[in-house]
């Protein structure tokens, strides 16, 4: 669960997009609410070992129908606010989690869609979660009993600083260190499950893989969560916990928790809330599916920021519109696999909503290090994120199983293992931006070409295509272009693709031969051609000139001819596609009587010498000697005729 800087960026994002002048003021006003102690000492919760890093070992599988219980939990001093009655609360969360299942995205709760809507779309309907809402149950104690934190204190004693578990009268406290968050969270989980089992009996349906274990349980508790800065430190911190619990004879493999409300505004030091969006729920459920966090758990480096729901992307539009899974995350789940790029090519990539995939560029010096390229546009679940920036996202991955399993993917600032290559070479993210304006300016230029119009990523550009093993990738991306239809075109290991030649009409068509020419193509050194009959290639070759003489054909053959331009080195240019074809027929090997026709034809002697052009029915008026002549029609057809 990523800590939200102050409510700072959260509230800034909630303002109308035209209110540019307010962003810096609001950012600075709220920044004091960002507790330095909290943002720098999140160690235990954020770094707690999780069974993440592999879908194969995840508690919840990412394919097929998976049933998940969602337990609504109120406290002795805090009830739900999304509705006035328990029935209303249940109905709200039924749709919040499951939507309507009628093929239409459910937006009635203010989010871009329901939890189920998100995962069905991201998985191409491979993963079909079904959420069973239970409760609300009411716990025996106040929220502070379950959410209180434990601190250690550094106290000045004489000239020394000592660490104590408890502050005594007269102690001079230098600072405090968070040693444990939500000290009674285990009691929260076990009590919530026990009370839920009193009102709901059929828990066997949540053992999706038949291993006699409930795969997971998700809690939604009433009120705010501690993840929003300025919040009460006694609130529970949303998270996913991989800790087996046995309650009433049932084994629960893991649980996750999120809050009902989020801060919407602040007045006279009182935070006014509204129902939270789907973002945090999606983030925590993704942990149960095996994904680690992609933010820097030390709150220093850029990580993935808004470009992943496993980082700040869960808070898109204040959590109401988290972004799409990245191409890496969809590949991780086995939903839409990455395509390996190994040969020079020119790609035109749609965004995910339009069927696009991600492409993997392997570092030849390391099997675990690679780039992923994908197209992010303001479409589908990227509708809000796409307002921040759009274009080609280049993600640098340096996989290490141990780092993934320990949930420390981006915890080393100078060796981030899952982060973007920013087109503007700027990484002022939520951890380091001094203002909302600076943060948004960074995002606007992160993707290629971005607002800095960076069309290339090579070993020599800024930024350069660097890797940890080997120094440089040596696989350039050039001419990165966003097209009007929302696709992105990129040249991989090449300057581009040659234009297809423009064919002229064939000439000198005889029974067994013809000539044909085409326009020359810049940077082409050769041309490949094919002669096709009945769908099969009957002749092919390569020539250096923009013309070819073809012979050895059969009479009366209906032919297709096309050509493509070729370059010497694919790293300079790659071959063109095939040209548009010319269709025509060779001459027949029989002689027709002079036809009656008013069509204009060219008349040739039997050895191919042009004689004249006229209408067919006028030929008998001309002073031709008796003999065989060839009539060639404007559509390329020819025939032999006998003039007596």
Specify the residue positions occupied by each region the protein language model found:
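Residue-level detector of functionally pivotal "anchor" positions at catalytic/ligand-binding pockets or at interdomain
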Residues: 495-509, 581-607
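Active-site recognition of the HExxH zinc-binding catalytic motif
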Residues: 219, 279-293, 373
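Non-catalytic C-terminal accessory/binding modules of secreted extracellular proteins
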Residues: 21-31, 81-145, 151-152, 229-271, ...
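Active-site-proximal segments of metallohydrolase catalytic domains
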Residues: 52-60, 109-251
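Conserved aromatic anchor
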Residues: 512-524
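Extracellular fibronectin type III
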Residues: 555, 568-587
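C-terminal tail/sorting-segment detector
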Residues: 19, 587-590, 626-644
